[in-house]
């Protein structure tokens, strides 16, 4: 299966434009929830007060620039639905509590990796990824929807924005092309805590600088970040979370891969052209297949960097997920666990 629809997991069906029937269901649902909302008014008010008390002075109204235009958030939201990949972790890192979230890597439980385990006070309603259940989202009565790291599909955005103000992908952020830094900035602004966001960013950037300083051998080295699914091999292009991670450590993404980049975050690599994966270091992630399907493949083993022993194949799903998720929580985990794996073959 191709990775072009989903950067992390076997793709489901693409999102489709909402039908007239869906609009009718959503409209009826919103009206119904409004009519019977008296029993939860005190809870909602309390949540709003608690949320507002954490906002920074002068933070609202907040404006977030997106591909779909500037989105204005008038007051700090109390009921946030975090749909984009890593959006829920961004909210949690900033002290928020999403009422709904998408589980992009099928972690189960609260839908977050072990680096964010235990941060929810109350488990969120889990929402689909490529095809979010719009009725389920509307039933949560959100006052803000976050979808900063997704496909950037116009129909998806149009449907979500009918439910609540929606912060979609940034300009140039189609197909999951947004870094943890930009995602943190956007979410922090929407939640009214931009200074807290900048503090988290500064802390994370220091961790990158410290890791890079500890491994001067990374500087200037070329690296290929690839994956294999049931459909075949591929490699990630510059501008994605994975490449941002390694570039901050001093690596340079494989120029031969970047030369073939299109609109997607990823290029397919045929078996006849696996030498395209060659670099000073080749790092591979198995998706939906055992790691041995990569490491034992004779054509992969013939790639010069692999043959020379300068390769890493992730065989730990947690490490792979941390490297892929690209949130302030997961990159800290990855810096601790993944960087030593990169260093070993370059000694």
Where does each model-flagged region fall?
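Sec-dependent bacterial lipoprotein signal peptides
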Residues: 1-34
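A short, structured surface patch at a secondary-structure boundary
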Residues: 87-136, 149
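Structured C-terminal subdomain patch of bacterial secreted/periplasmic proteins
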Residues: 277-347
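Extracytoplasmic substrate-binding proteins
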Residues: 156, 162-229, 324-347
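Proline-aspartate-enriched helix->loop->beta-strand connector
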Residues: 141-147, 165, 274, 279-280
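Extracytoplasmic ligand-binding site segments that recognize negatively charged/polar headgroups
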Residues: 106-110, 153-155, 170-186, 220-245, ...
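Short, low-complexity, disordered segments immediately C-terminal to signal peptides
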Residues: 23-27, 36-61
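Basic- and aromatic-lined ligand-binding clefts that recognize polyanionic substrates
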Residues: 79-91, 196-256
């Amino acid at each position: 299966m191709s990775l072009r629809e989903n950067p992390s997991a076997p793709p489901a069906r693409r999102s489709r434009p909402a039908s007239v029937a869906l609009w009718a269901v959503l409209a009826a649902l919103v009206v119904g929830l409004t009519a019977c909302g008296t029993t939860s008014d005190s809870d909602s008010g309390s949540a709003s007060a608690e949320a507002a008390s954490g906002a920074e002075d002068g933070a609202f109204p907040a404006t977030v620039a997106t591909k779909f235009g500037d989105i204005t958030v008038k007051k700090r939201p109390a009921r946030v639905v975090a749909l984009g990949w890593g959006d829920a972790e961004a909210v949690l890192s900033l002290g928020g509590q999403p009422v709904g979230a998408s589980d992009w890597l099928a972690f189960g439980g609260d839908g977050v990796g072990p680096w964010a385990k235990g941060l929810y006070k109350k488990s969120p309603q889990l929402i689909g990824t490529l095809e979010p259940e719009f009725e389920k989202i509307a039933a949560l009565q959100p006052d803000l929807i976050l979808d900063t790291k997704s496909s950037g599909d116009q129909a998806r955005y149009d449907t979500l924005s009918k439910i609540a103000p929606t912060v979609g992908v940034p300009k140039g952020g189609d197909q999951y092309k947004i870094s943890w830094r930009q995602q943190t900035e956007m979410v922090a602004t929407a939640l009214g805590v931009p200074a807290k966001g900048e503090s988290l960013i500064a802390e994370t950037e220091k961790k990158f600088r410290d890791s890079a300083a500890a491994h001067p051998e990374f500087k200037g080295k070329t690296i290929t970040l690839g994956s294999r699914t049931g459909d075949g091999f591929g490699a990630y292009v510059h501008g994605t979370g994975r490449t941002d991670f390694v570039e901050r450590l001093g690596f340079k993404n494989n120029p031969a891969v970047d030369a073939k980049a299109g609109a997607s975050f990823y290029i397919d690599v045929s078996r006849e052209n696996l030498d395209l994966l060659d670099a000073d270091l080749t790092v591979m992630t198995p998706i939906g297949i055992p790691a041995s399907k990569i490491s034992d493949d004779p054509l992969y083993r013939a790639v010069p960097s692999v043959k020379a022993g300068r390769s890493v194949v992730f065989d730990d799903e947690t490490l792979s997920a941390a490297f892929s998720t690209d949130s302030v929580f997961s990159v800290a985990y990855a810096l601790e666990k993944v960087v030593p794996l990169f260093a070993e073959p370059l000694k």
